[in-house]
Amino acid sequence: MSSSSEYRFLTYINGTVVDYIEWRLPLQFIYSFEVGMMVTNFLEYVYTFYLLLRFRAMHSNLHILLLLYGGQYFFSMISRAVLLYFQFHDAESMNDPSFADLIYTANYTRTICLFVAFNMLPFLVFERCFATCFAGTYENDRHYWIPLLLISIMMPVCVFSAVAYINNWFSIYTHGILLIVLNIGGSLLLIIVTKCNIRLHNSYSTLEHHGLYSLSERFQVSENIKTCQWLSRIQGSILFFNVACVSLLVLENVSMNDKMVIVSNVSFNILCTIYAAVTPIIVIIYTPEWTRETIRLWHLIFLLSNTDQLDLRTTFGEEMNYSDKNIESKVYFDQLQRNLTEEAMKKSKKKHRSSSWNNSEHEIFL
């Protein structure tokens, strides 16, 4: 990391220091591993965006915030790739001013994107607070102004925090404490919102409040509980990675030992990459619609390719492969009609035999 009283890098290591302590070769190996993980993460996020755009597994307002949460990673990944390129090629030896401008742009982009990720959890919970306040109309009216309001508040805060961090306007302790407090506060607020919705839902069963709530309000409160429980399952990993990454960021900036600074920096970047890889997996696991689609695609791609194709045949061994679906449907219904007719004839014959037997018995008794 290169930092001074005027400018602070978030994810960059001074190559001169690396050469001095003779760590260039192991760091290049670690960077190669990070690049491989970033390629895997890119494919993972493309698939996650396919699920986000294909299936509406949550309210549209929460859906918009998740699109922003996942979308920032593409810009963060591109900027990190630029920094890694210059890290591999020893940017300190490049005297072209355009290289320096590109490094600064990548640094600003990555820092802003990471601050968006670090601040997202409380804003996801704020959306659930609005859903609780507007329980009667939240599903019908949508209230698209809510995510716009939250984003219009969050983005300036994240941009200002990133610029303040880079330009060293505040101490690293200020940034670290604020981010940790925001994330822990968001988790506590989620617990409170969940309990409020459960208490509100339980009050419906009492005779005292039975007629005070409409059917749409009851449905929305049930959806709030379901969504809050879903968010509670995934917020644990988000909280852990946010607090861990911020702690490493603080450790990196307060360490006086060059080796400790580099270890903290590398650990921070690897942890951010793992953070980006784990979060979509957890969301997919706890979202039933996404899980079913993932299982379906898994069977379609990996299992069916290893299974022998069996041709459909009639009871007489004739193949039933038809290029035209209309012909196939006609053959199916013709066979079905033939089977139904045969069963009806068998029942009719059986009934006729039974009737004949009864008549013969009657004649004997006479």
From Swiss-Prot:
Q: Where in the cell is it found?
A: Membrane
Q: Does the keyword Transmembrane helix apply?
A: yes
Residues that span the membrane, as ranges: 33-53, 64-84, 111-131, 146-166, 172-192, 234-254, 266-286
The source's domain of life comes to Eukaryota
A GO CC term? membrane
**Keyword line:** Membrane, Transmembrane, Transmembrane helix
Membrane topology for this entry? Answer: Multi-pass membrane protein
> Which biological processes are named by the entry's GO terms?
sensory perception of chemical stimulus
Tell me which InterPro entries the record gives: 7TM_GPCR_serpentine_rcpt_Sre (IPR004151), Serpentine_rcpt_epsilon (IPR052854)
Entry keyword Glycosyltransferase = no
Q: What is its main location?
A: membrane
Q: What family name appears in the similarity comment?
A: Belongs to the nematode receptor-like protein sre family.
Name this protein carries in UniProt: Serpentine receptor class epsilon-6
Organism annotation: Caenorhabditis elegans
Q: Which gene encodes it?
A: sre-6
